[in-house]
Regions:
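Short beta-rich binding modules
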Residues: 1-144
Length: 144
């Protein structure tokens, strides 16, 4: 590769906003405007196609690089409590999520890092909420 050559960024998928079945396949940490965690999920859209989407949340790390338990009001804490109800937040092993099937609320990511609306051509789908398949208590299921 020549010096100064740009590597193209893969386009992020976009599907209709709604609730879909998904399966968590992996997770990873990433630093961009603060430390983030990505819960990577295979979502099955209305046509039966498998789309790779992520649940993205901010996290805090100790000096040793370990995740600090999220606040109870955070979207990460709510997701972990719903998917791993018998595990204390301080004891969460994110590897326990891998292989879990869940319901995923998918919405368009419309804002940039400055909270300004991006041009529509730059919108992409992201998972905003995740719940167990068998759990029908959540309001968002009635939105569609």
């Amino acid at each position: 590769m020549k010096k100064g050559t740009f590597i193209p960024v893969p386009t992020r998928p976009r599907i209709s906003e709604g609730t879909y079945k998904g399966k968590i396949v992996s997770w990873h940490q990433f630093f961009s405007h603060g430390q983030k965690i990505f819960i990577n999920t295979e979502v099955v859209d209305n046509t039966g196609e498998v789309i790779n989407l992520s649940f993205i949340a901010n996290i805090k790390l100790t000096e040793e690089g370990l995740m600090i338990a999220p606040k109870r009001s955070s979207k990460l804490s709510k997701m972990l409590s719903a998917l791993l109800p018998s595990v204390a937040m301080n004891d969460v092993d994110l590897d326990a999520l891998i292989g879990l099937q869940c319901l995923c609320r998918v919405e368009d990511s419309k804002l940039d890092s400055h909270k300004k609306t991006k041009p529509e051509k730059d919108w992409y789908s992201t998972i905003t909420e995740m719940y167990p398949l068998e759990d029908q208590r959540y309001e968002f299921l009635d939105d569609d």
